[in-house]
Amino acid sequence: MAETDSFLHLARPLGPVAVGSAPTTAPLNVVIQPQAIFSILDHSLRRNADQERVIGTLLGTRSEDGTEVEIRSTFAVGHTETTDQVEVDMEYQKQMLALHLKANPKEVLVGWYATSSELNTFSALIQNFYSGQGDGTWPHPAVHLTVSTEPGKDIETRAYISAPVGVTAERAADSAAFIPVPYEIRYGEAEKSGLETIASAKDAESRATNIFTDIEALERAIEEVLGMIDRVSRYVESVIDEEAPASTALGQFLLNALALAPKVEPADIERDFNNHIQDVLVVSYLANTIRTQMELSNRLATAQLTLGGEGASAEAGAQRGQRGGRGGRGGQQRTQERASEEVRA
């Protein structure tokens, strides 16, 4: 991912719009969830060969004061674009938006995305649609997220809001001034672990990777930490030996990192770490035991049902046999009675 740039926001006059209908163009911060980026990349991979870019809708949440927007999910919107015109399936966009908002009531429409860093006249038209009244984000600004998907290059992301410009209202409807806003890709520890697992398959010929167990993941994390410590140690030694230029910012960062280290003895750290490992092993053992017990209970219940069915069938057969025997004895008795009557006659 490209590094986040710094932005200076300047207030500018809006275009000629009706009184009381001007959208908000206050500076804001955009937070992007990794699953939204993956959805955009997946849409880009599935595009037609003759399409230079694809577009879609951004969904997420907005803070109460409107200064922070969090992009959580996306969905693709079909469009055709030529050098002269652009056509967007707005009806499909409205129906999909209604379905998503029904499934996720806490999310709202926050903007749209495009898989190209280029901003042109068509971008202004689409931006004005998403930021308009009714089906748009008005009175809040619509966020335009650009994600470059050129093969062989790093993924570069940019976030914009817009302000209408133009001498007349008609010109303002076809134009927009895109204002870059700061953004960040925010993820938790679980998402970071998943991203690292996916990234480990980029150098494999099969483009596949294995899922590590908790112990293996812990071992890899410790190895990475040891590697970073060795790299920092070599850098500090090279600075002391005047083999590398010193960096005040990096030195301050290392000093702050060392200040976070707990003031305890190494023996205490090792003891606590070993206790933690034992706790992890106990929890893993108990989880496996519970899983085994559940599987065994299911198998025993299935076996009892099978045996019960066979016993019921055998008992029913025996009862039918007994009824058949009684019927045979009754028939034999009736035959003997008829023979006696014939003899008396």
UniProtKB/Swiss-Prot annotation:
Task: Share what the entry says about its subunit structure, partners included.
Answer: Component of the eukaryotic translation initiation factor 3 (eIF-3) complex.
Q: What is the source species?
A: Neosartorya fischeri (strain ATCC 1020 / DSM 3700 / CBS 544.65 / FGSC A1164 / JCM 1740 / NRRL 181 / WB 181)
- Which segments carry the region annotation Disordered? 310-345
Regions of compositional bias (Basic and acidic residues) in chain numbering = 335-345
Locate the compositionally biased regions of type Gly residues.
322-331
- Bias regions of kind Low complexity — which residues? 312-321
Function of the protein: Component of the eukaryotic translation initiation factor 3 (eIF-3) complex, which is involved in protein synthesis of a specialized repertoire of mRNAs and, together with other initiation factors, stimulates binding of mRNA and methionyl-tRNAi to the 40S ribosome. The eIF-3 complex specifically targets and initiates translation of a subset of mRNAs involved in cell proliferation.
Concerning its family, UniProt says:
Belongs to the eIF-3 subunit F family.
Keyword terms of this UniProt record: Cytoplasm, Initiation factor, Protein biosynthesis
- Cross-referenced InterPro entries, in alphabetical order? eIF3f, EIF3F/CSN6-like_C, JAMM/MPN+_dom, MPN
Give GO BP annotations, semicolon-separated: formation of cytoplasmic translation initiation complex
The name this protein carries in UniProt is Eukaryotic translation initiation factor 3 subunit F
